[in-house]
Amino acid sequence: MDRFVGLAAGFGRAARDCHEPGRLARLMAYARDDFPRALVHEWRSAALGHWDRHRSVADGEASEPEAGEKLLLYGTTLIGAVLTPWLFVAWQIGDGDLAVVEHDGALLRPLAPAEEDLGDETESLCGAEAWRAVRTHWAPQFDEARGPRLVVLSTDGLSKSFASADGYREFVVGLDDRLTEEGADGVRAVLPQWLRQASRYSGDDTTLVAALRPEHLALEAEEKTES
């Protein structure tokens, strides 16, 4: 994850000037093509470096595994996003969920695959050409007040805790309602309990991160919708 954070921070800095002529098109090309390749390269370097540093002394006389075999031991999925006032980009490989509540309350899952993975099988960063499996959500925000009011990223342990996709959608809608009524502090206090309960149902780890639009922008969006 730290490798993603480093790349995402650099992308976020570059996105500050996305209104320069031609800049948005270059950023889109980088987000869809170069960023996934850079992410996989950084992850592979970190994984193989860890192998070299922590290889068991007892394995000293054993034949050296191929790089692909080493990477299988570190295989992982990833979902992450960059949010700026004028640009929203997200990347995903493997399982996990991105839910977006738009300014008008519509709920979208823009990175949901056309076909769900069977069982526990999923794409992973350890794949031979993993960058090809990275899904990208690209959404310029030409009107800051109409940007998404809530973005939720979570591991698949959360969505799997529900009997159907409708249950997950209802959870996100409920989260949005609670944030509106109680504020971030109130939800933050009870969220760990919700996630522990979800983990018990799914039998898998459950992690969630959310970004909530500042209240003054939400009010501006409501005023524009009414007008």
Language-model segments: residues:
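PP2C/PPM-type serine/threonine phosphatase catalytic domain
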Residues: 1-227
